[in-house]
Structures are given as C-alpha cells and as structure tokens.
C-alpha cells in the first residue's frame, strides 16, 4: 500500500536562518560516536546522503580526545570529501540545545542543502530541535529517497504501509533521519576527506548533564550485531530467560534481544527490546525463541536476512515471516541446540 503526501510547515514566524537556494550545494552527515567510537548507524546515513550525488561532508562533534579517536576511522569513510570538526567539552554529552545550535550555524555557513543523521536516540533528540531553529520540516526514519532530493519514503503503521513524502520547496534545508537497517554501510577504506575545524557555538541553556549509567557487555551491540537471539514471554521468568538465551547467544557470538512482552514482564532490560517501540534490527541471523510474533515485534526485525523461530504453537504469527521454523518446547530444544553447536565452529 502506497500513500503520497506533501509535508508543509507553518510560516507564522520568520526563519532564524535565511539560506540562498542558489548556494545549496552539499549534503552534511552528522557522524555520531560514543566516547570516540564511531557509530555504525552513521555509515548508513552516509550511504543515504550519497544517493543525491552532491558533495557529501561529515561532522564530528565532541571533546578533543573523543574526536581524535573517532577521526581515525571517520577520515577513511569512502564518499566523504570533507569532515568538519567541532571540538569542545560542551559537546561531550550530545545535549540537544548545544548540538542543534551548532548544526544550524554550519548549515548557514557551509551551503548545506541536506542534513542527515541516523535515526538513533541522539538523532531523534537533536534533529527535531534543529528543524525548529531552521523553520524546516523534519523528515524522520526514511528507508529510501530519490536523487531529486525532495522525495523520501518512510514506513508507517508498524511497517505495514509505506509513506512517500514530498518535502516543501519552502524548506531551506532538508533535515532527515535515516533508518540504518535500510541502507548499506558506507565502506571504511581508502577515504580521502579534507579535515576542517569549525567555530564553536556557545549556547546559554538551563539544561545540564547530570549523569549516565552504562551497561558493560562483552556481547555485540544489539542495534548493529550480525546475529541476534531474542526471547519472549514464553520463557516464563528472568532466570529462565538468562539460562536459556545466554548460552545460545554465547555459542553464536550473538547479541541478546527481547520482545516487549518479555520486557514488560521483567525478564529483560528495556534496552534489549526489539520492535516498533524498541530497537529496529536487521542482522544476518535472527533467532526468535518463545516469541509469538506480534505486529509490533515484527516491525523491528522482519528485515533480518535469516529468521529462525522456535515456538511450540504451530499457529504463531512468527512462523509467517520465519525462514526456518521449529515447533517444539523451547526448554528442551534450545539446550539441545547449544549442545550441538558446541561440536561445530560457528
């Protein structure tokens, strides 16, 4: 099902930045990183930006040490002709007020026609504020775009329909977040980007960073893992969830995920939730254990390359999207699978 719509924004107030359309010649990608480690999702945003055929530039923001660590990999990204650096301690925690003001100033000074970021927590926090500063529409969570640069595609209704959006010609810059699973990652090899520092923008804001608690895990990051093992409410308890899923995930070198039902029941942390209101993943292998296959969960994993489902209910909706299905008691079949995997190299 295809819908076509044109987004319009109210022009009740004067835009804070007036840009000349004749000078808009480049695309800018916000290169997200965590403590100097470049986000894999940003590589997909680079690929989306390259679709337009414009010069594509990147932006790294953070403390001096963070940028030095991230730049080693960022400057190797194929397709970026320039990387802007904004080095300041005020950017160390990605506060939306500071980053939005910085991005707005760069858009004005560097002739940017399109601004891209991955549709992550940071992108979803910063880009709506930026759209407000520039008085432009926010085009969020796209899965495709046309080379014309004004037509975009995004999923709606939990991925059961696709919306085609034609942005308003009044928007001085197109502000876009990208669903990373919909685009290949830009190669990190043989890059030749020119490095340029940009002016730091100081923002007077009441928002202050207080603290953060990081969960340390030896497993791959769920959002970018090549293999994911997810569990549902059928695991019955947190103890069973850990006892059944963790050995299989360890055998496969996989990340652990969970359905919303499992998270709501307290079996797994909210950070592990896969689905419409959780993380959207598209690994090479997705193993769904004790997950019925509610539409909200399918929206977060149905683009996986290979889906294996284990469920004792032969009518479970998960089997409709699975490439391989096993109708069995998970408490018997999964330990047996782990035992068999111990005899082979995965």
From Swiss-Prot:
Which amino acid positions bind FAD, per UniProt? 285-313
Transmembrane among the record's keywords? no
Keyword flag Transport: yes
Identify the InterPro entries for this entry: DHS-like_NAD/FAD-binding_dom (IPR029035), ETF_a/b_N (IPR014730), ETF_a/FixB (IPR001308), ETF_alpha_N (IPR033947), ETF_asu_C (IPR014731), ETF_asu_C_CS (IPR018206), Rossmann-like_a/b/a_fold (IPR014729)
Q: Which GO terms describe its cellular component?
A: mitochondrial matrix
**Which SMART domains is this protein grouped with?**
ETF
Report any one BP term from Gene Ontology.
Answer: fatty acid beta-oxidation using acyl-CoA dehydrogenase
**UniProt xrefs under CDD domains:** ETF_alpha
Q: Which Pfam families match?
A: ETF, ETF_alpha
Give the note describing cofactor binding and stoichiometry: Binds 1 FAD per dimer.
Tell me, in one coarse class, where this protein mainly resides.
mitochondrion
User: Recorded GO terms, molecular function?
Assistant: electron transfer activity; flavin adenine dinucleotide binding
> Which cofactor(s) are needed, names only?
FAD
Q: Where in the cell is it found?
A: Mitochondrion matrix
Q: Which UniProt keywords apply?
A: Electron transport, FAD, Flavoprotein, Mitochondrion, Transit peptide, Transport
The protein's role, per its UniProt record: The electron transfer flavoprotein serves as a specific electron acceptor for several dehydrogenases, including five acyl-CoA dehydrogenases, glutaryl-CoA and sarcosine dehydrogenase. It transfers the electrons to the main mitochondrial respiratory chain via ETF-ubiquinone oxidoreductase (ETF dehydrogenase).
Q: Its family? A: Belongs to the ETF alpha-subunit/FixB family.
Name of the protein in question: Probable electron transfer flavoprotein subunit alpha, mitochondrial
Species name for this entry? Cryptococcus gattii serotype B (strain WM276 / ATCC MYA-4071)
